[in-house]
A protein has these predicted regions:
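Small-residue (G/A/S/T)-rich helix-start motifs and N-terminal tracts that mark the onset
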Residues: 1-133, 142-159, 164-231
Length: 231
């Protein structure tokens, strides 16, 4: 059971998460369990998109589509033929896919370059109109610190999932400053971006406008490349 540490901070474990996963009806079909769009995988980092899309499927999404660089399509289909894959050369290719999902993940394997920047900019412009759940991770978080994104208004159904280094960039402080007071850092990020914050690391912190949750699980087993792309 979720344990209160203070009136505003609650501790949770994997058991708490498991209890809140809805049970599926025997008559359920793929259309009952959501359509997830994963926007990920710039040149040379197709694996990040492939792993993110695969983890979405394993987490229970009924349908998953990966939007990535065209050169990664064949690798994705070879590994996960059940995941739909679309190639994107520019922001127009993204717009054609935005009417389909009811949840979006963007950022794994994206970088500070023109392709990633135009894709993320178009996404943020369009989803503020739709207000569907969007999770931003990795390269998307770095891009949020760019001047071009400084006046973007993010809605409160968005989730930002920085590790300490990304959080430091977002708050313009050192990583040591983030780690010194992780709860306060998460609160500052929430206030700055008006989103749900998941500050990753030992004792992952989830922070929204009203409450803070502290994860009691986790360890050094996750300290390998790729785990961030599936979290």
């Amino acid at each position: 059971m979720t344990k209160k540490i203070t009136p505003l901070i609650k501790e949770f474990s994997f058991k708490d998460i498991k209890r809140n996963i809805p049970k599926r009806k025997n008559s359920a079909h793929k259309g009952d369990h959501g359509k997830l769009l994963v926007i990920a995988g710039d040149e040379g980092f197709g694996g990040a998109g492939i792993m993110s899309a695969e983890s979405g499927l394993k987490a229970g999404a009924g349908l998953v589509r990966l939007l990535t660089r065209k050169l990664h399509i064949s690798a994705s289909l070879a590994r996960n033929p059940e995941i739909m894959v679309s190639g994107a050369d520019n922001a127009q290719d993204l717009e054609e896919n935005l009417s389909w999902p009811n949840a979006i993940v963007a950022g794994p394997g994206m970088f500070e370059n023109f392709w990633s920047e135009q894709i993320l900019f178009k996404l943020l412009v369009k989803i503020t109109e739709k207000k569907i759940p969007v999770l931003l991770d990795a390269g998307a978080l770095r891009l949020l610190t760019y001047k071009a994104f400084s006046k973007m208004k993010l809605h409160d159904q968005m989730v930002l999932t920085p590790h300490p280094g990304e959080a430091a960039d977002m708050l313009k402080v050192s990583t040591q400053e983030i780690q010194k007071n992780r709860i306060e850092s998460a609160k500052k990020l929430q206030k700055k971006y008006n989103c749900i914050i998941v500050l990753k690391g030992q004792g992952t912190i989830i922070c929204n406008k009203k409450e803070i949750y502290l994860c009691a699980s986790g360890g050094p087993e996750l300290a390998v490349a790729g785990t961030g792309d599936i979290l």
